[in-house]
C-alpha cells in the first residue's frame, strides 16, 4: 500500500486546491486524503473551518461539494454582493461560503427536498446565519405548481432532481440503479418560476444567482423571459449534458442567455457530461 504522502505528490495537479483546503481548515490533511481517495473518513464527519464555521458531512458527496466550493472555488463570490440566491442549496455549503465571502449579503437558499432542507436549516442555525439566510422549500421550474423529486433510496442528496424523462440518465453513475427506475411517483414539492423566486427577495435585482439543479437549468432559464433574467447580475451555473436527441446543450443555453444581454466569462467543461459556467449581465 502506498504511503499517503507519496500518493499526494502523485496528485500534483491538485496542489493549488490542497493549499486552499489548508487555508480553510486545520483538518485539511484528512479531508484532502479522503477527497483524493487515499484514506477514507468516517461519516458523519464534523468539519471546523479556521474562520469558525462548522459543517457536517453525512456522505462522501458532501465532502466533494465542500472541495468544489471551498478549495476549487467553483462559484466565485464578490465581497460587495448584497443579494445572493442559491438555487439547489443542498445542505448549504455554498450558502455558508457566500455568507462569509459577502458579509453584507442577504441570501435566499432554495432547497425543495425535505430531508436535505432539514440539514440545510441545521447548518444555517448552527452557524448563526438565520438573520441573513432565508430558506425556500420550492423547486425552480418552467411553471409554478407542483413538481416531483427523486424518492429512490440510496440516491445521494446532491443528485436528487425534479422528475423529467429528459434527465432520467443524468449522473446515473452517482445516483445508482434505483434512481433510473424512478417514475412520476416521487416526493411532491411546490414549484416556482425564476421570476416568482426573484420576487421572493423583494428587490429589483439579485447580484448573484448560483444554480445547480441537475438538468432542470435548461427548462428554467430558457423559459424565463428576458425581463426576469435581467434581474440577475451574474449567473454561476452548473450545466449538464442532456440526451443527444433533444438537440439541447450548453451552446443553446448560452445563446439564449446572450440574447438577454449575458456575456460568457468562463466555461469549465469537465468533458464528462457537465461543467460550470459564469455569465455576467452587460448593463451597458
What are these regions (language model features)?
Residues 1-284:
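Phosphate/nucleotide-binding beta-alpha loop and adjacent structural elements of enzyme active sites
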Amino acid at each position: 500500500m502506498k504511503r499517503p504522502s507519496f500518493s499526494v505528490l502523485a496528485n500534483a495537479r491538485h496542489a493549488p486546491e490542497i493549499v486552499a483546503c489548508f487555508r480553510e481548515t486545520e483538518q485539511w490533511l484528512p479531508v484532502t486524503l479522503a477527497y483524493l481517495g487515499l484514506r477514507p473518513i468516517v461519516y458523519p464527519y464534523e468539519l471546523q473551518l479556521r474562520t469558525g464555521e462548522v459543517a457536517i458531512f453525512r456522505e462522501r458527496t458532501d465532502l466533494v461539494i465542500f472541495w468544489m466550493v471551498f478549495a476549487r472555488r467553483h462559484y466565485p463570490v464578490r465581497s460587495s454582493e448584497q443579494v445572493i440566491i442559491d438555487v439547489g442549496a443542498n445542505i448549504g455549503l455554498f450558502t455558508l461560503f457566500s455568507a462569509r465571502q459577502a458579509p453584507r449579503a442577504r441570501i435566499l437558499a432554495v432547497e425543495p427536498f425535505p430531508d436535505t432542507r432539514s440539514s440545510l436549516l441545521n447548518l444555517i442555525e448552527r452557524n448563526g446565519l438565520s438573520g441573513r439566510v432565508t430558506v425556500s422549500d420550492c423547486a425552480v421550474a418552467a411553471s409554478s405548481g407542483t413538481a416531483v423529486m427523486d424518492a429512490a433510496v440510496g440516491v445521494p442528496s446532491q443528485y436528487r432532481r425534479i422528475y423529467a424523462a429528459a434527465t432520467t440518465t443524468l449522473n446515473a453513475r452517482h445516483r445508482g440503479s434505483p434512481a433510473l427506475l424512478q417514475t412520476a411517483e416521487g416526493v411532491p414539492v411546490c414549484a416556482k418560476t425564476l421570476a416568482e423566486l426573484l420576487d421572493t427577495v423583494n428587490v429589483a435585482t439579485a447580484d448573484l444567482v448560483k444554480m445547480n439543479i441537475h438538468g432542470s437549468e435548461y427548462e428554467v432559464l430558457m423559459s424565463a423571459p428576458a425581463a426576469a433574467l435581467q434581474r440577475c447580475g451574474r449567473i454561476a451555473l452548473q450545466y449538464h449534458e442532456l440526451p443527444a436527441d433533444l438537440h439541447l446543450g450548453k451552446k443553446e443555453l448560452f445563446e439564449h442567455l446572450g440574447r438577454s444581454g449575458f456575456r460568457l466569462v468562463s466555461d469549465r467543461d469537465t468533458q464528462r457530461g457537465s461543467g460550470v459556467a459564469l455569465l455576467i449581465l452587460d448593463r451597458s
